Amino acid sequence: MFDQATSMGDGVSEERSPLCGKSATSCSERVRDKGTRADLECSLRGHSLKDIPVTSTSSPGSSKEEVQDSQSTGEADYCRRILVRDAKGTIREIVLPKGLDLDRPKRTRTSFTAEQLYRLELEFQRCQYVVGRERTELARQLNLSETQVKVWFQNRRTKQKKDQSRDSEKRSSSTSESFATCNILRLLEQGRLLSVPAPPNLISSSQNNMGTSSGNGTNLGTSGSTSPIISTTPPGAGAFSLQVPSLAASSSPRLPTSLCFPGPLLGGLHEIPSGYGLGSSAFEPYTRLDRKDTASSKKSTS
C-alpha cells in the first residue's frame, strides 16, 4: 500500500514536474525582484536620497564621452559666472563671455614729463616720422622705449589732422560770411538798393548843387538834409533829377518834397509826395508816413 502511494506520489510528482519546470525561470525572477525591492526599501529607510548612488545603464565609455561633451559645451558657453546682489537684495548671475580674458593685466598709461614732451614736440616739428636709428637714439635720450615713442608720434599725427580739418571748416565758413557781407556793403555803397534805377539812354552831364535845372526851368524843391543833388539832362529831352541820401545820414532819411520826372522822359509828370519816406528794408524802399497835421485836417473837415 505504501509502496503504491509512494509510487503514485512519485508519479504525481513526476507528472507535475514538467509544469514546475516551465515556470521555474519566472519564479526565480520574481524572487530576485522581491530581493531587490527589499534592499531598496531598507536603503531608503536608513539613508537619505542624496546618499544613494545613481546607477546608470550606460557603459563606462559612454559616460566618459557624456562628461567630456558637457565640459566642452560649458567652456564654449561662458568664461566665468559671477553672482551679484543688486540694490533690491536679489541675487543675479552674470555670465561673462569666453573670449574675455580677466587674468590679463591692464595696460598702464604712459605719463611723460615736461622735458620729454618738449623734446618730442621739437622732433615732431622737424620730422613727423621718426624711424630707425633716430627713433632708437631719441628713446635712449629720453629714457623711453621705442614703442612709447612710436605711439606718441602716431597720436600726435592724428591730433594734427583733426586740428587741420577743424581749421579748414572754420576758415570756409568765415570766408563765405565775409564774402556775403562785402557784397551787401558794395551794393549799399553803390546805392543800388536805395536809389531808383535810371533809364539806360540817360547820360549824366552836370551836377547842380543849387537844386535848379537848366532844361525846362523846372524848379525842384529843396530839403533840409545836406545830401548832394544829382541832376542829369539828356540832350533834347526833359530834365531828370534825383536826390540820393548819404549812408552817413540818420536811420530814417527823408526824400525831397517833390521828385519830378518830366513828360518826355517817362511819358507824364510823376511825383512822389512828401508823405513817403525811405524805408529800412531794401524790398520796401518807400513807406508812407502818417503825420499829425494830416490827421487833424481830416478831423476838421469831417
Curated annotation (Swiss-Prot):
Record field: compositional bias (Low complexity): 204-223
Superkingdom of origin: Eukaryota
PROSITE patterns: HOMEOBOX_1, HOMEOBOX_2
Record's keyword annotation contains Membrane: no
Chief subcellular location: nucleus
Gene Ontology cellular-component annotations: nucleus
Annotated Pfam families: Homeodomain
Recorded GO MF terms: DNA-binding transcription factor activity, RNA polymerase II-specific; RNA polymerase II cis-regulatory region sequence-specific DNA binding
Key words, A-Z: Developmental protein, DNA-binding, Homeobox, Nucleus, Transcription, Transcription regulation, Wnt signaling pathway
Subcellular location: Nucleus
InterPro entries listed in its UniProt record: EMX-VAX-Noto_Homeobox_TFs, HD, HD_metazoa, Homeobox_CS, Homeodomain-like_sf, HTH_motif
Presence of keyword rRNA processing: no
DNA-binding region in chain numbering: 105-164
Compositionally biased residues, Basic and acidic residues: 161-172, 287-296
GO biological process: brain development; central nervous system development; forebrain development; head development; neuron differentiation; regulation of transcription by RNA polymerase II; Wnt signaling pathway
Region (Disordered): 1-35, 50-73, 156-175, 199-223, 282-302
Family: Belongs to the EMX homeobox family.
UniProt function note: Transcription factor that may function in dorsoventral specification of the forebrain. Regulates the expression of Wnt signaling antagonists including the expression of a truncated tcf7l2 isoform that cannot bind ctnnb1 and acts therefore as a potent dominant-negative Wnt antagonist. Plays a crucial role in eye development and, in particular, in the specification of the ventral optic vesicle. May be a regulator of axial polarization in the retina.
Protein name: Ventral anterior homeobox 2a
Organism field: Xenopus laevis
Name of the gene encoding the protein in the UniProt record: vax2-a
